[in-house]
Structures are given as structure tokens and as C-alpha cells.
Amino acid sequence: MTAPILVATLDTRGPAATLGTITRAVRAAEAAGFDAVLIDDRAAAGVQGRFETTTLTAALAAVTEHIGLITAPLPADQAPYHVSRITASLDHLAHGRTGWLASTDTTDPEGRTGELIDVVRGLWDSFDDDAFVHDRADGLYWRLPAVHQLDHQGRHFDVAGPLNVARPPQGHPVVAVTGPALAAAADLVLLDEAADAASVKQQAPHAKILLPLPGPAAELPADSPADGFTVALTGSDDPVLAALAARPGRPDRTAATTLRERLGLARPESRHALTTA
């Protein structure tokens, strides 16, 4: 196993979780070598004073340089167009350092979340990478042939498109899911059980698999079936930060400019580039 991927999960609940304490925790995780942090407000539902996850992600993008920022699921009733617009905008704000936890359900019996992911990915591809030319002399803002309608008609969603945001810096922000059911649609799969790792690798060989860190932070397992670990952080003074920062052979991934590069994930081609090549 190469140097494992490390993703911190951060509790953003209640009055103790101020913007200052959250910022300090994320910056401490960045200094300790974490590859990303999951800005998770799911446990904060109904807690007075909690932060909205996408707003918090945007704020953290302004005060960090290297660490990836994975935003928790948006409300279930959000339309795919709004989800794609918010997540694409966040990726632009963070210069390609974001991810989206599309679902925390371990099953998708109705296929709704799988369809949502497919539609959102399609909307991210509305503009080719070179669509915007900003040519003031010729009065040309974008190349019309580089704009694509989605025209999706499915069981749960009918979405025409196109999205009114340029293609994200990563092509697609990193898509994360929990559990094996949606692994084939994801880039990053968060599992609870190591026993699921082999089957996920078979159905989604392109994806990176993370398991909860099973023991002391200074002893990262070398024989794990996963590509890395999730680590729950309590704050900037969590002892796990010092232990991980001091570990021998700690990789330096600061040269990576996007979260995809940090995780070893390829930048996806646009579906339109693939069909017209």
C-alpha cells in the first residue's frame, strides 16, 4: 500500500463550533498532512446555530491552500441543476480542491441518487473546457458549439440544461458516497466494513476506498484493503493531528493543485468530447 489517503471528518455542531474553531481545526489538519476534510453538518440537524455546509465550505476555501474540501449532501429536495451549480461554483472558488458527498445512504433502492449523480455530472459538462474565449475585440464571450444541452429525461428527473457555470477546474469535483451501492457512480467510497472493499474494487476499480482508521493514528495499517482512512477530528488540539504530523515517511502532496491530483484520480473527459472524438 502506498502512502494512504487521509480524510478528516469534522463535527460542525452547536455553539462551540464557531467559524474560528472550525477554521483552526481545518488548517491544523492541512498542516498535519490530511488530504481532505469532510465538512459534515448531518449530525447537526436541529441544532441551533449550525453552519450551512456549502457556505462554510466557501469560507474555508479562502483560508486554506492545499487541503481538499468535501461538502456534505445538499438537501434531498434540491434539484440537480441547483446541486450542479453550487458544487461547480465551489470548485471554482477553491481552485479545484472540492468534493461532493452525494449521499449518506448505503442503499439506493429507487435509483434516485444514482440518477442524480449522472445528471449532475452531465450538467458539469455543459461547457467544454475551452468554451469561454472572452474576446472583447470580436465581441465573443464563448464559442456556441462548445455549449451542450443535456436533455435528460429519466425516472426521477427531467433536466434540459445547460448549466450556466463554466466547467469546473477538476472537470468534475470529486464525487463521494457512503457504502457500496453507489460505488460505480463515485470517485471516492467511504465504507464502514473492510469486508466490503473487495467487492467495491471489482465494481468500481477507478474509485478510491476509505475505511475508518482502526487504531492509533501513529500506526497506519500497511495491510489495509482500502486506499486510505477517515479520521474523526474533535478540533485543532486533537492529539491525532500531532501523531499524524510526526509519522515517518509522511508524504508531501502539496505540489498537487487539485483534490483529484492529491487522491490520484484522473480528470474526467467531458462526455461530449468522448462522443465527438
Curated annotation (Swiss-Prot):
The keyword Oxidoreductase applies. InterPro entries: Diverse_substr_monoxygenases (IPR051260), Luciferase-like_dom (IPR011251), Luciferase-like_sf (IPR036661). Coiled coil: none annotated. Pfam families: Bac_luciferase. Its cofactor is FMN. Keywords: Flavoprotein, FMN, Monooxygenase, Oxidoreductase. GO terms for molecular function: monooxygenase activity; oxidoreductase activity, acting on paired donors, with incorporation or reduction of molecular oxygen. The keyword DNA-binding does not apply. Heterodimer of two subunits, SnaA and SnaB. Catalyzes the oxidation of the proline residue of pristinamycin IIB (PIIB) to pristinamycin IIA (PIIA). This is Pristinamycin IIA synthase subunit B. It comes from Streptomyces pristinaespiralis. The gene is snaB.
